[in-house]
Amino acid sequence: PQEIQVFRPQSWGLIQTAGKKLGIEVVATRRTIALKKQLQQQAENYHNANYQPLSIESPPPQPIPDVLMGDKWQFVTLTAKELVTEFNDRPIPIVSMPDYLLPPHWGLGANVAIPGVIIYGGKQSMRLARWIAETEPVSLDYLGDDPGGLVLDAGLADRWVMVTFNDPEVSRAAKLYEARKKLVHGLHFLLVTPDDSGITDSGIWLLQK
C-alpha cells in the first residue's frame, strides 16, 4: 500500500513508526469509511455488549483562543444544490468539500436542506479559517449542557468549544440543527466569512457527524 490511514490515537505512534520503516505514508484521519463499515458489521455479530470498535476516548472540549473569536454567528441552511454550486465561482482561500461527502454521493435531492453554521470573523476571519483548517475539522455539534454550545470535533480526538449560549431560543435552533443533520446522513457545513456582505468568504468545510 502507498498509504495507511489510522483513526485511533492510541495506534498512531506504533503504526507511524512501522510506516517509516516500510516507506509507507501514515495518515491520521477519522474518515476511514471502509474500515469503520467493516468493524461495525463485525460488531453486529459480536455478543459482548461492551464491544464498541468505533468508540474513541476524547478529552473534554477546550475553548478556542480568545483572539480567534468571531464577531457573531448563526445557524443557516442551504439546499443540496446550493451547497454544491454556491461556492464554485467564489475565490475562497480554504475549501474542504471532498467528493465523498457531497450530497449527491448520499443520494440526496437538489432541494434537500443541509444545515450549517456561519461564523462572521470580522478582521480575524482569515486567521480563524486557517486555525480551523489546521485542526482538521470533522463535525460541529450541539452540546446541551448549561450553558449550551457548539463543539468542533477535529483531528483524531480533539474537541474545541466554538461558541456558548444559554438563550432558550438559540437552544431550540441548535436542537433543530441537530435534527436536520440526522435527516441528511449527518452532513452539515461550517462557513467562516468576514461579514454578512456576501462578497468574500474565508473558508468552508463540508462535515459529517
Give the ranges of each region predicted by the language model.
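Secondary-structure boundary/capping micro-motif
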Residues: P1-K209
